[in-house]
Amino acid sequence: MSIFLCFLLLLPLFLVFYKRLLPSKGKLPPGPISLPIIGNLHQLGKSLHRSFYKLSQEYGPVMFLRFGVVPVVVFSTKEAAEEVLKTHDLETCTRPKLSATGLFTYNFKDIGFAQYGEDWREMRKLAMLELFSSKKLKAFRYIREEESELLVKKVTESAQTQTLVDLRKALFSYTASIVCRLAFGQNFHECDFVDMDKVEELVLESETNLGSFAFIDFFPAGLGWAIDRISGQHSRLHKAFARLSNFFQHVIDDHLKPWQSEDHSDIVGVMLDMINKESKVGSFKVTYDHLKGVMSDVFLAGVNAGAITMIWALTELTRHPRVMKKLQQEIRELLGDNKEKITEQDLEKVHYLKLVIQETFRLHPPAPLLLPRETMSDVKIQGYNIPKNTMIEINTYAIGRDPNCWTNPNEFIPERFVDSPIDYKGQHFELLPFGGGRRICPGMATGMTIVELGLLNVLYFFDWSLPYGMAIADINMEEAGAFVIAKKVPLELVPVLHY
């Protein structure tokens, strides 16, 4: 009797599972054999982009997997990426509904993770016209230049005392200060409810949870729900979200104080004005959840990615003294020896710096997997049938190491971009640090300016050396992170003022 009852209880679970595993019509991409219930999850390590890369060496550039019962197709070449992001952009431009992204974006009320539709189109339009326009980029120039001067001042203090600089902390503080001033109107050098250590803790904790695996997203029926609660995953997600949400509420409350400045030019101020004026675009109305969703996008994507890119660039420059010497010589010859301050006008003069940044993006994309997409209909890509509701993963880490795209792909050679039309703006599919198609990052211009200005300052005013007794071969290149990939071991260098 008990066996019969168990069978009845488990029957719905197996029916759902069996239905999901029924073969699709047409030719699916190749891939490893999946196991019942867990699919191919047992073949994936902590570093998802590296696991995909390794599997693609065996199964090819278009590969079919199952995350539990969810079908996933991984694309690992520029040709495949172009078909997804250009040829079939419309059919693949929505996002999968995952529990972590839904939570941290206030039920997908943001721009990055929202499902494709009218609300997303209106939010995207708002972002391009009001939040990240070229006019806004110019208006906030003074903030970026002030923070870069402060970065130079702090590093100068270390140079004068001949002490190591933890570039993770220095560059995180630089990017976080800029992003929080232009987005939140908060100068954390003067803020009374949070400091920079707290900001860093919030960003890292939130990104870790945002990129974490929730069983409820991939396992059938109530099984995933139960495992998430037993394992503590559900509790961890909600605790991290509560801390982030509390921080956002502090920022909003600060804007709503009656004695607050009349300057509403920051992103929070602009969106609060829209909420208070009850303005509508057609049937679309901006709400507090939309505001917090955008805050989440900007805070989590804008702060860490820029710092990570600068750290990887400085790491590669330290490992390649020839490139470092060539870059610093060009910078100092073009800008002159006695410059007291770097401005954004100087960025157009330093061509080799741009090549170094592009080569850094190729080898160390801040997000080695683009944000996942989902097919909205059956679609044929690279000769394979991809069913509706399939998760799409584009592995930019693999594309950056594809020998069919790049000569000596594992070598750091900025000169490969000399006289090359390839850039980072989403039209060249061998280099996609900001994504491509309809879902390309709206903050791309701001992000690039922050990175270029930060690197130009630390490379113009300072020479850099390894700590005493450390050799280039000792530099640790291990990665860490899930959502964005940072250097695991901090890069600590000795700055020397260049006169």
UniProtKB/Swiss-Prot annotation:
Coiled coil: none annotated. Its cofactor is heme. Its main location: membrane. The chain crosses the membrane at residues 3-23. It is an enzyme of class 1 (oxidoreductase). Keywords: Heme, Iron, Membrane, Metal-binding, Monooxygenase, Oxidoreductase, Transmembrane, Transmembrane helix. It is a single-pass membrane protein. It is found in: Membrane. It comes from the Eukaryota. GO terms for molecular function: heme binding; iron ion binding; monooxygenase activity; oxidoreductase activity, acting on paired donors, with incorporation or reduction of molecular oxygen. GO terms for cellular component: membrane. PROSITE patterns: CYTOCHROME_P450. Heme binds at C441. Its EC number is 1.14.-.-. PANTHER family: CYTOCHROME P450 71B11-RELATED (PTHR47956), CYTOCHROME P450 71B21 (PTHR47956:SF70). Belongs to the cytochrome P450 family. This is Cytochrome P450 71B21. It comes from Arabidopsis thaliana. The gene is CYP71B21.
